Amino acid sequence: MRVTKTTGGLSLPSTAERAAVLSAPVVETSFRTAFDSFAALHAVEVRAPEAPRKLGAHARIAFWNAERLKYEAASARLLVGLEADVLMLCELDLGMVRSGNRHTIRDLADTLGQGYVFGAEFVELGLGDLREQKAFAGQANSAGLHGGGFVSGAALERPALVRLETSGRWFDGAFHERRVGGRIAMLAEIRLADARVLLASVHYESHTGPADRLLQTEKMLDEIDAHSPGIPVLIGGDFNTNTHEREERAVPGTVEKSLAADPRRLQAPMAYEPMFDLLKRRGYGWNACNDMDAPTQRTRPDGTPKPPFGKIDWLFSRGLKCSTPATVAAVDSKGDAISDHEVLAVTIALA
């Protein structure tokens, strides 16, 4: 499912609309009805920069799972320091109390004096995960949107949202959150020396395993080729490549045993994640795009998540020359984490 309808402002789900979904029977038909009814899930919000900057033969691109983008000032300082031409972002809130009921990507774009593209991954029916439910008990979301997108001073052309799945697996609350929507890849084109290049900012499902990640990858690549056939591509995302099926992770000792057999498994998951073989067959590479020795996870100030950590965020390229890949610590001026994911950055040029 590819959404190409654009708007200057998404239609925000009202408190009453979200409450009505919460009170409906927890069955598939309720999910489908809710998914179809929330207009915010079926459009892409776009604001162009006032004076778009023309890119030359090279561009510095960064990807970050910003974990709600809730630390506004610290996140802006971190991202300004990257001097990136385009920021590819996921886990962005719009109207969530956990991030101050702000429009986080618009606020970031305002701070940077740039344009943005935003698409909604989920309509959140609650306050967030168990930590957030406890921290913000008794408060309310103003809109309840969570998604991904881009920020850039350059023109972001032909924006689109690809819905990687609409299973409704978050609808019944089995993962301690109730949500309407599904994982997404946000697409937009930039121009390097007037040549079109497609960027994809991606967030894969965190509660499945390698087999489902393969399916999401196939869907994503097919939609990329349908949207922008024959042009160079850079994909950045949180791919959650933890190398285990959800059922395996639930069995005590399974992860520890697998790491004892292969201590590099989480840092170099290629042999355990068939999505890498598919990407290779479809012409994508990753070694030149990534700092291959650096994990991309870190512990938040509340002590979660805990090691062992690995590389779950990746950049993949096709038809591009990648150089100077970096993994940048997602911390504030005191060294405290502002996300549980590090920032990835790379310089791209036409191959």
Predicted regions and their residues:
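Metal-dependent phosphoester-hydrolase catalytic domains
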Residues: 1-46, 161, 210, 224-234, ...
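Structured beta-strand-rich core segments of catalytic domains in phosphoester-bond hydrolases
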Residues: 3, 24-47, 93-194
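Acidic/histidine-rich helix-loop elements
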Residues: 14-23, 50-72, 94-97, 130, ...
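Eukaryote-specific, low-hydrophobicity, charge-rich regions
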Residues: 33-66, 76-86, 115
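Active-site beta-strand/loop signature of hydrolases that rely on acidic residues for catalysis
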Residues: 60-65, 75-101, 117-121, 151, ...
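Soluble or luminal CAZymes and related metallo-dependent hydrolases
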Residues: 70-71, 100, 143, 179-182, ...
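Active-site-proximal loop/helix segment associated with metal-binding centers of metalloenzymes
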Residues: 179, 197-204, 263
